[in-house]
Design a protein with these regions (language model features):
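Alpha/propeptide regions of enzymes that mature by internal proteolysis
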Residues: 1-103
Length: 103
């Protein structure tokens, strides 16, 4: 059995895509990454992702974290620039020894 919820309207499309992955017995990590990337990629959301508000130097800096519930491994990034989907980097880092990156 699986479940996935969204608490903000901006996540509905991503949750729908993730639900399809889970219904087809896909990987939960893939489903979560898909859901988050859908939000990160939408330019009209000003609090997160591609459309995020810039810092005082007028640069958009993004943060993300990922945790694998089976292994409890984590990955995180902070203040990265020029990359559309920080959740993908965080997920990849969860598989490495050094799981935290800044900038």
């Amino acid at each position: 059995m699986w479940g996935i919820i969204a608490t903000w309207r901006m996540a509905v499309e991503g949750i729908s895509e993730a639900s399809h992955i889970l219904q087809e017995k896909g990987d939960a990590g893939d489903a979560i990454e898909t859901a988050i990337k859908a939000v990160e990629d939408f330019p009209y959301y000003k609090s997160v992702g591609y459309g995020g508000l810039p810092n005082e130097e007028m640069e958009v800096e993004l943060d993300a974290a990922y945790m694998d519930g089976n292994t409890l491994s984590i990955g995180a990034v902070a203040a990265i620039k020029d990359f559309a989907n920080p959740v993908s980097i965080a997920r990849r880092l969860s598989k490495e020894n050094f799981s935290w990156r800044r900038g």
